[in-house]
Amino acid sequence: MQLLNTLLIGITAGSIYSLMAIAFVLVWRSTRVINFAQAGMALLSTYFGYEAVTRIGSFWVALPIAMLGGAIFSALVEVILMRVLVKHSSSGPIAGVAPIIATLGLLGLIRSVIAMIWGGQDLRIPPPVSNNGFTVNGEVLVFSPLKLLILITTLILMALLTLLFQRTNLGLSLRASAYAPEIARLSGIRVDLIRNLGWPLAGAAGAVAGVFQTVNGNGNFSPDSIEFLLLLVSGFIAAVIGGLDSLLGAVIGGLFLGVVISFVLMYLSGGLFFIAPFVLLLLVLFIRPQGIIGAKAERHA
């Protein structure tokens, strides 16, 4: 039973990592930028969700509001900041690096603004369903209705986004705008508008990750919550492990990372918690640099 519980703990944590990894993939696929501000956006969206829960009293209304808030904020970041940086950093000594550096600065700025508006105290979002484990043959599992909800939500979101990218003209335009923007413009695609769509989608996915990260713990969060920085690191590593161009890879990478960390904590040492993800990342990069599922983008451009 301990083995099963360890696996289920890893799957639940991995589902949340997958949601954050999906956000990284969406931004990368649309604008070829690594958005390290994603944790700050997820944290801000969680505050939006908190305000909705406090005022309306329904988690099921608060979650879409958090997603909408995250989507709008992410779109504004792309239009006001990232689009200008990408355009003006196409050449020079830090070509291509300036947008990434900017996202790190934006992460700190978001957390500071949140502290100014809401203060530094812990706030709480109660879980929407029970977090008491299911009972099987008289044994209580750690897997609960809440953890099942997190897993199902991750899979549904991945499926919907995959359909969007693979089965619609909009998805084709998003991919073309990322890989070959000049050719896409010559084909009549409004590249700037299309690129902007990847950011709000990522903001919505990150919002779900932030809210679920909160309710899957003790429900408390603050501007200094270490959980969101851990979510940032885990989500990025999961995206790289799975392949930065693959939504399916993001989900597989997140689940794989979650399970590995869970087994390391249970059977090896808690001190390896921060080391294991990076060791796993290096192993994957050595063996398969494009990730488990990731395609070689240049070949398919």
Where are these regions (language model features)?
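Membrane-interfacial amphipathic/re-entrant helices at transmembrane-helix boundaries
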Residues: M1-M20, F48, I56, W60-A62, ...
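Inter-helical junctions in multi-pass inner-membrane proteins, predominant
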Residues: Q2-I9, L164-Q166, G198-A239, L268-G271
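Membrane-embedded helix boundary and interhelical linker motif in transport proteins
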Residues: S30-I80, N220-S222
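Pore- or pathway-lining transmembrane helices of multi-pass membrane proteins that form conduits
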Residues: V86-I114, E227-V240, S269-R288
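Membrane-helix/interface signature in polytopic inner-membrane proteins
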Residues: L160-W199
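Cytosolic-side transmembrane-helix boundaries in multi-pass membrane proteins
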Residues: Y179, L186, R190-L193, Y267-A301
